């Protein structure tokens, strides 16, 4: 008999690094979730841009079950068919010639930064170890990646931090140019800063970074953990910009909810990595790669990407209508189905309150700092779910603005 659990048990049993919502989801289908009490939610949070095809997609369940009935794991002393097939799909769909599989975005970024340093050390010299990243970025929670992320609140308690990492202002080419020099081995950047406020890079900024990296023999790393796998209306966001990185990291939506990450690069850069220089126990796990292969099959189609662009327009239109009514947002921005509503000054710091009211109204949204409400719904969310979810979001906005009784 299963143990009966409640939200209060989290506070009793779990390390307190999260503050989960007061409800516990127990079942999902498409873009809808139901909690222990049977209440329905429209899911515009998407597991933080993970559930690209919603919950319990039948094709993903089939791929997982089929592989689960074969075998689950062997470790990196052996390869497997699903991993090789997924690698080939990623290579065929991108600039990449080599793939490294891992379990998360943080691990993918850790691998990318290690590769960049090793390439510079082997090909140029040990002096070339500098990494340039950007303020308000987020690249993961390992000590290396949290140091590269330009948010001191995430790293300040863990000193001493890895050295030779400097941070420029995002979308400011002059700021980046002042830091990138011949001692720089890598520049790591998000095409859209997700945790930093859903801020898309300008084309001129990314093109300028590409030119600076070429000039100083530094590798350009695109962190596409949040923007990748169709989220922006292209398979990867770099395709919007006409700027090709040397290394790309991907995770989140790649597994559609099953943990997986990957680092993509070229044969030349990958060649400095030899057996033992890096590794992972679970990376390339056949369960994860079987599911991810099916995710790519579904998402990497013109129909899906056109659908993301159409759904983007539907969200923007309805969010603008909500804003005309309530005047709460100074800007609505983003690419594809990664969107952020920036709060007006009078509502500054209240993004979390809006998210809480939204949940009471029956819609799940995210935040990106205290001033931005973030949306990362499934890429196949229906028109009806968009309409219903944003009607519920409007109710939450009304409740917050008027100070009325809580929703629900």
UniProtKB/Swiss-Prot annotation:
**Gene Ontology annotations of biological process type:** alpha-amino acid biosynthetic process; arginine catabolic process to glutamate; arginine catabolic process to succinate; ornithine catabolic process
Please state what class of enzyme this protein is. Answer: transferase
What protein is this chain from?
Succinylornithine transaminase
Q: Name one GO molecular function term.
A: pyridoxal phosphate binding
Please describe what this protein does. Answer: Catalyzes the transamination of N(2)-succinylornithine and alpha-ketoglutarate into N(2)-succinylglutamate semialdehyde and glutamate. Can also act as an acetylornithine aminotransferase.
Q: Name one Pfam family in it.
A: Aminotran_3
Cofactor (UniProt)? pyridoxal 5'-phosphate
The EC number(s) attached to this protein equal: 2.6.1.81
Reactions catalysed, semicolon-separated, are:
N(2)-succinyl-L-ornithine + 2-oxoglutarate = N-succinyl-L-glutamate 5-semialdehyde + L-glutamate
**Which pathway or pathways does this protein act in?**
Amino-acid degradation; L-arginine degradation via AST pathway; L-glutamate and succinate from L-arginine: step 3/5
| Keyword Transferase in annotation | yes
Q: Which organism is it from?
A: Salmonella paratyphi B (strain ATCC BAA-1250 / SPB7)
The gene behind this protein is: astC
């Amino acid at each position: 008999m299963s143990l009966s659990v409640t939200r209060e048990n989290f506070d009793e049993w779990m390390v307190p690094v999260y503050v989960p919502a007061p409800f516990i989801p127990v079942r999902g289908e498409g873009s809808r979730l139901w909690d222990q009490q049977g209440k329905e939610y429209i899911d515009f949070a998407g597991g933080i841009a993970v559930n690209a095809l919603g919950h319990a997609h039948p094709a993903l369940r089939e791929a997982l079950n089929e592989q689960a009935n074969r075998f689950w794991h062997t470790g990196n002393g052996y390869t497997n068919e699903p991993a090789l097939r997924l690698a080939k799909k990623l290579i065929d769909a991108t600039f990449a010639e080599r793939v490294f599989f891992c379990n998360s975005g943080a691990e993918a970024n850790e691998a990318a930064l290690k590769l960049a340093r090793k390439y510079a050390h082997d090909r140029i010299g040990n002096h070339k170890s500098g990494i340039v990243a950007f303020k308000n970025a987020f690249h993961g929670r390992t000590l290396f990646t949290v140091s590269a992320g330009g948010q001191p609140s995430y790293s300040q308690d863990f000193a001493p931090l890895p050295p030779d990492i400097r941070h420029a202002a995002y979308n400011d080419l002059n700021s980046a140019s002042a830091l990138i020099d011949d001692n720089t081995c890598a520049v790591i950047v998000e095409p859209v800063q997700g945790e930093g406020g859903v801020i898309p890079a300008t084309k001129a900024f990314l093109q300028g970074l590409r030119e600076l990296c070429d000039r100083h023999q530094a590798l350009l790393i695109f962190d596409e953990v949040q923007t990748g796998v169709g989220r922006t209306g292209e398979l990867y966001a770099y395709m919007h910009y006409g700027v090709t990185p040397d290394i790309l990291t991907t995770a989140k939506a790649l597994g559609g909810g099953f943990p997986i990450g990957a680092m993509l690069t070229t044969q030349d850069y990958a060649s400095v990595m030899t057996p033992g220089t890096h590794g992972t126990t679970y990376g390339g796990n056949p369960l994860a790669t079987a599911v991810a292969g099916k995710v790519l099959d579904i998402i990497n189609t013109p129909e899906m990407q056109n659908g993301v662009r159409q759904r983007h327009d539907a969200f923007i239109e309805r969010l603008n209508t909500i804003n005309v009514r309530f005047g709460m947002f100074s800007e609505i921005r983003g690419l594809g189905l990664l969107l952020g509503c920036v709060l007006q000054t009078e509502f500054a710091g209240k993004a979390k309150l809006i998210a809480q009211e939204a949940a009471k109204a029956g819609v799940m949204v995210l935040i990106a700092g205290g001033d931005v409400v973030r949306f990362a719904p499934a890429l196949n969310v229906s028109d009806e779910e968009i309409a219903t979810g944003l009607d519920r979001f409007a109710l939450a906005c009304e409740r917050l603005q008027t100070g009325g009784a809580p929703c629900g």
